[in-house]
Amino acid sequence: MSHPLFDISGRRALVTGSSRGIGFALARGLLEAGCTVVLNGRDAGRLTKAASELPGDVHTAVFDVTDGPSVAAGIADVEDRVGPIDILVNNAGMQLRAPLLEFTDTDWHRILNTNLTSAFLVGREAARRMTERGHGKIVNICSLQSEVVRPGIAPYAATKGALKMLTKGMCADWGQYGVQVNGLGPGYIETELTQPLVEDEEFSAWVRRRTPAGRWGRTEDLVGGVLFLASPAADFVSGQVLYVDGGMTSVL
């Protein structure tokens, strides 16, 4: 028998950027835990395909998480069609690798909007309703790079470091209304988008050497952390980032 502290069956969860990769795996985990899940992205066809591959009560919501009016309309539509959002996972994100001296203004604003502004916009709209109802869980997908950085990814690390502090700020503002806001910080995770790095033997050897667990992470490694942070077991946990990185942030 499962412990009631970890029971989230019947809750409604919105996962942004969930047509593939980490977001898709987190959506699957929430569905398997008994949640109703709404997948989000900008490509309707890709979302429909993703939904067809998942079990349980799954819905889709096409809206641009970097555009305020689109987010406001999207959240309202989700609550009208599916019901009140109990759990929000701000997963939408991107990576652009380039030395800082070569990083363009356009790419800077693009990565900032995708990784940080989206969490602010979607989090704010969801929290308007959560705070009125007196409960809610928000999980922002941060990163190992919220704490440390390698050459060539400074803008990405800047957005993820800022997302860590936005998480703490959301906690400070909304905690009094029964809303817990936490972060999940993946380490190096094998996905479709990281496959070129996985196949780079020199880089993969570095990852294995630097990670006490001795391997790349898998998307399913992240599910347990999200299920915990979304559950009643985490009702007195807020403003924290749970790093799921095989121990990388703990060693030199």
Predicted stretch roles:
Residues 128, 172-173, 235:
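Alpha-helical segment proximal to the catalytic Tyr-Lys
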Residues 2-4, 148, 227, 238-252:
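Short C-terminal tail/terminal secondary-structure segment
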Residues 123, 159, 167:
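Active-site helix of classical SDR
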Residues 175, 180, 237-239:
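Short, small/polar-rich loop/turn modules that mediate ligand/substrate recognition or access, typified
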Residues 99-100, 107-112, 138, 203, ...:
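Substrate-binding pocket helix/loop in short-chain dehydrogenase/reductase
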Residues 12, 19-20:
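Conserved glycine-rich cofactor-binding loop
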Residues 143:
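Residue(s) in the substrate-gating loop at a strand-loop-helix junction
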